[in-house]
Amino acid sequence: MIKLTPPMGWNSWNTFGENINEKMIFETADVMAESGLRDKGYEYLVIDDCWSLRERDENGRLVPDPEKFPHGMKAVADYVHSKGLKFGMYSCAGNMTCAGYPGSYEHEFVDAETFASWDVDFLKYDYCYHSPILHGKYLYRRMGLALENCGRDILFSACSWGADETHEWIKETGASMWRSTGDIFDTWDSVKDLVAQQEKLHPYNGVGCFNDMDMLIVGMHGKGNVGLAGCSDVQYQTHYALWAFLGSPLMIGCDIRSMSDETKAILMDKDIIAVNQDPAGRQPYQVLAHPDYPVWAKQMDNGDIVLAYFNLGEHNFNQFVTWADIGIERSSGVKLEVTDLWSKQTLGTFDTGIEFGAVVPHGCRILRCRVVRG
């Protein structure tokens, strides 16, 4: 499957871990459809690890845990589809999944056929307990080939954590998205750590094969499977803006059945989502390079430029960007009309540059700039 914009959806792992069941999945599908998330673009509902029995059946096929999913996975898929959503599942390139359930190693084709028979639309494919002999590219090529021949269009999400220089070979596998890092946790330090690993990977991200910075922690507040210290709403807003601006898939990880208004506002901001889903799929570039106070720019398909200032430091800090910094010389006569994407305020038309103002620690400001001539 070729995906033209970063996939969006929800995944069970961050909050629920192995504590998943049919009732919770149905309730989550209901909320995705009724809250507005689906209509904002969150279309995939993905069940992560721990959904199967510990052993395959006598025919070598994976078996859903009947206590967790008493009606089977086809019934779950049917319910998810009835809500206008797409259904995702999980497996692993090793002989076991990360939680110790059967993996797909040397069962790639039979498992792909099984997923297709359940009407699965998305497969997250992890990298635990993988063969020490085979390079990751061979293991992911195997499942990619199996999915391409299973008789159903299934989005392939490769989760190899950036191991074995994933970025150099992942497009060979047919994957539409690929994890570039280890797992995220619900802390500000985890967000900063994952962002710091992205700069060298920008050339490998884009239309058809997106760099996955891991699921979102927005709205978790220290609860759930990867919940640790938690983050403030300001930090969650910056985390979301970073993932969106850098072109990562946007996979919600909180329990959306109990979202706060603040969480909803972050996850459903149409203007930030539009930056992530821009059809050009261009990568951002640094305008002002600073480890704690960077400013990035990104060119949109319609010619607009988005400027993003992320305060990753511990002090209020102002930044100023001149239009020359983004390639517009004063002699061109070009001005930029600037809109703040979070506040929705039009700030005015500027002919030489713009001052961001003092952004609070761990906060951000995202400005969309429209070219005005004459």
Predicted segments with their positions:
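Solvent-exposed beta-hairpin/edge-strand motifs
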Residues: 325-344
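Carbohydrate-binding surface patches
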Residues: 243-246, 251-253, 289-330
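Structural recognition of the beta-strand scaffold that forms the well-ordered cores
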Residues: 6-12, 41-47, 86-91, 121-126, ...
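Active-site beta-loop-alpha junctions enriched in small/polar residues
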Residues: 13-15, 50, 92-96, 128-130, ...
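C-terminal beta-strand-rich structural cap/linker in extracellular carbohydrate-active enzymes
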Residues: 348-374
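Glycan-recognition surfaces
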Residues: 107, 138, 149, 155-255, ...
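Aromatic-lined carbohydrate-binding/catalytic grooves of carbohydrate-active enzymes
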Residues: 24, 28-132
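Catalytic cores of secreted or luminal carbohydrate-active enzymes
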Residues: 238-288
